[in-house]
Amino acid sequence: MLSSLKDFFVLLLPFFIGIAFIYKLWNFTSKKNLPPSPRRLPIIGNLHQLSKFPQRSLRTLSEKYGPVMLLHFGSKPVLVISSAEAAKEVMKINDVSFADRPKWYAAGRVLYEFKDMTFSPYGEYWRQARSICVLQLLSNKRVQSFKGIREEEIRAMLEKINQASNNSSIINGDEIFSTLTNDIIGRSAFGRKFSEEESGSKLRKVLQDLPPLLGSFNVGDFIPWLSWVNYLNGFEKKLNQVSKDCDQYLEQVIDDTRKRDEENGANNNGGNHGNFVSVLLHLQKEDVKGFPSEKGFLKAIILDMIVGGTDTTHLLLHWVITELLKNKHVMTKLQKEVREIVGRKWEITDEDKEKMKYLHAVIKEALRLHPSLPLLVPRVAREDINLMGYRVAKGTEVIINAWAIARDPSYWDEAEEFKPERFLSNNFDFKGLNFEYIPFGSGRRSCPGSSFAIPIVEHTVAHLMHKFNIELPNGVSAEDFDPTDAVGLVSHDQNPLSFVATPVTIF
């Protein structure tokens, strides 16, 4: 019997050797086609190589491993894109293949199981949601209907600055700009100011906490069996509170708007009037074809609009004024352009603004150096695919480092310097057609909100340059600024913005 068993194993030995050889050959070949990758550690993968400022540490790694780099965040494969050419492959050439979103735990909790437009999976629901946002809420006609709101709130801001200047007070720029954007978007979305109601203060706190919460590291997203850590580090508690406060406020707003519209006989059928909530309620009531019936859609879309609008608009204003204060020669040139075009009149029209080429260049340059999303919202590969000669597996998360691309000296002369003149000689815009410059992303999953945010920033900066001379407070110099982007979903500055303003006597 023993002899028979020995003969049996001798006969099987070549078979096992062949299987082992084929496995090793397959394993070698598959690894050979993977993107370059730094060595990873057990359990945590490459998470130890991320700093407090991930866009910076990822750029440093890409300088060594290349513009298409494979990392592992825990057990999750993550492809990092750091060149315009690779970004074009992802967002244009293979746009549909990379059109999904990761199912982040925090996003699912706050956004009603991904019922919003930003994080919803690619498919029919997402197409319906995006169509409603683009055609009903962010169309040129709708945005133009909010012009009066924008002008009223900018005027109120200018009056506050003028009063502070008369008292020789230092102006808290972040507070001024946050109030401005919150009230413009509050009135546009809900028909009410955040700053004039008690419940609005709770929502302001939510809007302050939510973007960093969505963009912060959640260990459970990458190492699922460590999800219990969220109960120890306070993440779960904070997420519960933010979700609860947000839902209560949105429920109240929707109920109040529905009652008000019924009492007034409002008919917000896509005409020139109606805030976002009224428009959505009307579409729901009329059972418009393509309007999603899923519970939570209204709240999730409204949340998309206000979170995407308030924080990014306020931060862009922050960065524009910060860079102008640091670069006085740029501010002088911009003031000259604005004052020559507008003259002695108080109002600044859309026609005036269109003539301000240097203003447009200043805003574009601020967005180049400080994109609202330094790391674009990740995409997910929907299938196995070949990308620039590398094998990318289905389910791989894809991070596009827009911050690194916008500071790449291969595309930009003096890439770290604030030079608006570079945009006077090119036709780059915010549509994501030039992949060296993608502050709002590109392709199917790009952010459609630039048509709403940019006019607010343009008119605000134009009015400030026209009516005031602004400078740093006494004792503060440009060298004191360290414009470091903080961690989170959007690009916050760790340094508060303060300035003094002197009215210009040209009226």
UniProtKB/Swiss-Prot annotation:
CDD domains reported for this sequence: CYP71-like (cd11072)
One Gene Ontology cellular component: endoplasmic reticulum membrane
Cellular location(s): Endoplasmic reticulum membrane
Cysteines paired by S-S bonds: none
Annotated positions binding heme: 447
Superkingdom assignment: Eukaryota
Catalysed reactions, semicolon-separated: (-)-tabersonine + reduced [NADPH--hemoprotein reductase] + O2 = (-)-(R)-19-hydroxytabersonine + oxidized [NADPH--hemoprotein reductase] + H2O + H(+); lochnericine + reduced [NADPH--hemoprotein reductase] + O2 = horhammericine + oxidized [NADPH--hemoprotein reductase] + H2O + H(+); (-)-vincadifformine + reduced [NADPH--hemoprotein reductase] + O2 = (-)-minovincinine + oxidized [NADPH--hemoprotein reductase] + H2O + H(+)
Gene3D superfamilies: Cytochrome P450 (1.10.630.10)
A GO molecular-function descriptor: iron ion binding
Tissue-level expression: Confined to roots.
Topological relation to the membrane, as annotated: Single-pass membrane protein
Cofactor dependence: heme
Entry annotated with the keyword Transmembrane: yes
PANTHER family found in the cross-reference section: CYTOCHROME P450 71A2-LIKE, CYTOCHROME P450 FAMILY 71 PROTEIN
Name of the molecule in the record: Tabersonine/lochnericine 19-hydroxylase
Gene symbol of the encoding locus: T19H
